[in-house]
Amino acid sequence: MIKVIEQGSYMNRVDKLPDGLYSAECSYLGTHYECSVVFYIDARRMETVRASYAVHRTPKNDNLIEDDIPELVGQTCTFAANKIIKGLPDYDGNGFIKELLLENLRGINQAEMYMLEEMGIDGPIEYEKKWLNEKVNYCRPYTGRMPGLYDRPHYVNSLNHFRKQNLYNKYKQYTIISSGGDVVTANTTYQDSFHEMHAQLSYSLTTREITDFDMTMQRWPFAACFEMDHMAAGLFIGKNIDDLTKREVGALIGGSEGCFHLVDIVADVAKAARDLKNAGR
């Protein structure tokens, strides 16, 4: 008999508002938690003008709250805000709000290519040129100076269809399934406006060792991204799933030579596996 023992999903979107403002929303819906965050940002200065969070459900239904995060007001909404977010309180008791705040930064970064007027950039190709050096430690294509780097605007069709209202959407989901034995299987999916991938891994409940791993990439902006499809399988088999923090997964895939979206989906499953173990479920 197959039994779902844990599942969760992350949803993120970025939308344009009047007067140079944008909203970035991210939520998590899981078996034991429901949380969300919202940023309102000024793209002319790339600053947060308001940030709020909500905790709607926890295992014991404690720490339920909706409130603002004044520490982020007036701060950058770029990746430079990572350090500020990491220093915030653990609002929900399990790190979900902090993770959603970081997800929002990633979503804003992906949506930047549609904020060009506010940022004073002439067009998508000029945007890629601007980021050529600044993203050198960002992900595989930029770090490796891959051929066809300026193909991204063509791939995402921003030259023919420049998004004006809804700029970016993302959905991540995982399900951990047991068939009654010692080995459980996790299926995880990542889909956003520019990428799509699926991974499946199995691990032992007693030894915590990952016994199988496979992934498929269905959509990607660059040929260099697709190489991860062939490289990833051997990276995780034999590893202890409890050790797979984002930092550890990032190191395994080669840091900025790898795909940080793969980091996301593997680390999400590893966190869920640790949570199950710690809760005795």
For the regions a language model picked out, list residue spans one by one.
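Short, basic/aromatic recognition patches
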Residues: T185-T189
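Short beta-strand or tight-loop elements
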Residues: K172, D182-V184, H195-M197
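Short, Gly/Pro- and small/polar-rich lid/capping loops
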Residues: M1-S27, R152-G180
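Active-site- and interface-proximal helix/loop "cap" or "latch" segments in soluble metabolic
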Residues: V4-G144, Y190-R281
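Generic multipass alpha-helical transmembrane bundles of integral membrane proteins
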Residues: R145-Y150
